[in-house]
């Protein structure tokens, strides 16, 4: 039976591949603002779940009364962080219907990212993002959310578990996802995810299958416990190959006003350019309990990342119009462009950890080796090496006051002087977090050489302080959460437009001053007329200091949802019907340079304010969910769209449909 179902799923996938693409993952692992933030999710220990009786053949999924005994409540998962903290915080599958229609990456993360107007394109956070990596990095990050947004978790599935998701977006925008997990025995589980992402062009699409984004992600994971529970092993391997056919934005010809971006005959700048990122990551976590309050643990991470920009000059009609600078050095191939960087790391972390009453502690030593390669960069001319070894010491501590209140802290010190300090408090009425980090610059802003860019810099480490706190008050049908976020940056590294004629268009810059951003925020949820909800989120940002004009943040930023939520058809279907509204004030948004895969500060274009309104219908029946969504109602009414990134128009009005199914056999 299992084999037949997997074959059926494979046939469906193969038959639909022309429209398939991949976007966000299921609600189980998303971290947007939830519909009912005052509601606490149930915590379940797999040891408390009744074990099924052994059967002569196959798995027993029904009892003698044909009642299902396996389902979302018996298929449990746990994160590695909870395993590390010795928490038996197993969670049932989350089949929550709230916001199921938010399937694109930008909307999944509550519009806190900008992209290039299509699913799978380069992403950049609207608000300053604090990296948690102290040591050297590649400097490439615009495709990180497609890989990092869902780390593998580990299951106790009782019965085989299969999840299948498909979204058909208009004009070849779609999502597909398959996950399978099963227990080999009560102590050993394995599973996999597969997420192809195939998205058609939204500008001058020649027909179905004329792709802009081609991406394939998969992961394999397994967890094992010894019979006496002293030894634990968790393993996962992840891989992605993410390719985007870059169009360079819209080339204005007949109509050079803003309306020209929405012309049906609008042409792209680039025809043959492509960005690519490949990433492989092997992760192993294991621990052994010597005594009740004392454990030894080890982590191993092996990663490889390849970033490339490719182009064929003879295939471009606007090559020199778009790329105002081309490197004339004879060793650089500017006709068949293949620029970029390779980066490899191996990390070994060993330490001790344990529990004493309500206290958790850990201390560790970590060694990290790294190497990078750019075929056009001569390492002998640099003031630093392209490979090296980093040594860290650190520790974590957590106070679990009760099941709802916890205080955690983390300190990590790189022996060359860089560091990270972090503390977080979670209570039923207050969430607060603080972080201070001094981090090495990435390799890309330090040294790069390619067809359209070349530089060598001696940048220092970047200092960041971040504080945030949010109150949580529930008063009858009203939930309110006022709070604020304060960020301080010093020696901040960013990319900036270069207006000097004959020189490269974008250059990395290290600010000589500092930046300070203060962002008070208000989140609310109000229920009225029994089944109606309104959920606003409003953020005001004041740049208290912005040396070198390095930060570009809209002054006002808002998300609002108005929804009707109820059981329909005599209680056979749960429904959520309503409108999503996103709005932000006009500001000089960051531009994008595909040759180096970086967003940069520019002053020549203002992204106007625009109310982005979606209508959605989410439904749930038994073990399946579905949605209908009409995106960007305002453009259908006014005929005017929006520009989320200078030169790149946002998604026009369009209809999307999606569904998922979960099987237990």
Predicted regions, residues:
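Outer-membrane beta-barrel proteins
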Residues: 65-66, 73-77, 81, 167-169, ...
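Low-complexity, highly charged intrinsically disordered N-terminal segments
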Residues: 94-149, 156
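Transmembrane beta-barrel wall of Gram-negative outer-membrane proteins
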Residues: 174-196, 209-243
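Flexible loop and strand-edge segments within Gram-negative outer membrane beta-barrel domains
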Residues: 205, 221, 228-284, 305-317, ...
């Amino acid at each position: 039976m299992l084999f037949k179902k997997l074959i059926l799923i494979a046939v469906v996938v193969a038959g639909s591949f022309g429209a398939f693409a991949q976007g966000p993952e299921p609600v189980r692992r998303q971290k947007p603002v939830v519909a009912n933030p005052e509601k606490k999710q149930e915590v379940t220990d797999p040891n408390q779940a009744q074990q099924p009786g052994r059967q002569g053949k196959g798995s027993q999924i029904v009892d003698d009364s044909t009642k299902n005994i396996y389902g979302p409540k018996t298929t449990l998962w746990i994160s590695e962080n909870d395993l590390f903290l010795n928490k038996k915080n197993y969670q049932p599958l989350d089949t929550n219907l709230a916001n199921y229609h938010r399937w694109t990456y930008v909307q999944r993360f509550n519009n806190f990212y900008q992209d290039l107007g299509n699913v799978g394109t380069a992403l950049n956070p609207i608000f300053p993002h604090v990296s948690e990596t102290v040591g050297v990095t590649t400097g490439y990050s615009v495709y990180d959310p497609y890989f990092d947004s869902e780390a593998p978790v580990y299951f106790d599935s009782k019965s085989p578990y299969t999840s299948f998701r498909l979204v058909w977006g208009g004009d070849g925008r779609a999502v597909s996802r398959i996950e399978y997990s099963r227990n080999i025995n009560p102590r050993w589980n394995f599973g996999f995810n597969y997420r192809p992402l195939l998205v058609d062009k939204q500008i001058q699409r020649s027909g179905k299958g004329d792709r802009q984004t081609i991406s394939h992600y998969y992961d394999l994971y397994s967890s094992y416990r010894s019979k006496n529970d002293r030894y634990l092993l968790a393993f996962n391997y992840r891989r992605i190959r993410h390719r985007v056919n870059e169009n360079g934005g819209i080339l204005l010809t007949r109509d050079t006003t803003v309306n020209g971006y929405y012309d049906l005959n609008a042409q792209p700048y680039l025809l043959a350019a492509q960005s690519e990122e490949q990433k492989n990551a092997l992760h192993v976590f294991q621990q052994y309990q010597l005594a009740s309050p004392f454990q030894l643990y080890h982590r191993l991470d092996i990663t490889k990342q390849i970033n490339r920009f490719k182009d064929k000059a003879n295939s471009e009609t606007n090559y020199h119009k778009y790329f105002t600078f081309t490197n004339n050095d004879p060793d650089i191939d500017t006709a068949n462009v293949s620029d970029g960087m390779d980066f490899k790391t191996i990390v070994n972390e060993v330490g001790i950890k344990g529990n004493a009453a309500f206290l958790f502690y850990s201390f560790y030593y970590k060694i990290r080796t790294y190497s990078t390669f750019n075929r056009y960069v001569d390492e002998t001319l640099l003031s630093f090496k392209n490979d090296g070894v980093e040594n860290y010491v650190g520790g974590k501590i957590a106070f679990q006051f009760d099941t709802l209140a916890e205080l955690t802290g983390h300190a990590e010190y790189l022996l060359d002087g860089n560091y990270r300090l972090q503390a977080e408090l979670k209570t039923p009425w207050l969430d607060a977090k603080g972080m201070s980090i001094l981090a090495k610059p990435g390799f890309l802003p330090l040294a790069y050489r390619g067809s359209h860019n070349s530089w060598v810099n001696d940048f220092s480490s970047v200092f960041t302080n971040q504080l945030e706190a949010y109150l949580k008050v529930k008063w009858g049908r009203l939930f309110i959460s006022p709070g604020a976020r304060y960020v301080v940056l010093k020696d901040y590294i960013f990319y900036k437009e270069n207006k000097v004629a004959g020189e490269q268009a974008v250059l990395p810059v290290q600010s000589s001053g500092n930046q300070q951003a203060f962002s008070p925020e208000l989140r609310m949820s109000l229920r009225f007329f029994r089944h109606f909800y309104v959920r606003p989120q409003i953020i005001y940002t004041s740049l208290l200091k912005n040396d070198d004009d390095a930060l570009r943040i809209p002054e006002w930023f808002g998300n609002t949802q108005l929804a009707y939520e109820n059981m329909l058809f005599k209680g056979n279907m749960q429904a959520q019907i309503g409108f999503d509204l996103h709005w932000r004030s006009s500001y000089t948004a960051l531009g994008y340079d595909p040759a180096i895969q970086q967003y940069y500060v520019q002053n020549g274009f203002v992204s106007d304010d625009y109310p982005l309104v979606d209508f959605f219908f989410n439904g749930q029946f038994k073990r399946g969910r579905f949605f209908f969504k009409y995106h960007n109602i305002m453009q259908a009414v006014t005929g005017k769209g929006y520009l989320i990134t200078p030169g790149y128009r946002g998604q026009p009005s369009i209809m999307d449909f999606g569904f998922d199914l979960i099987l237990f056999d």
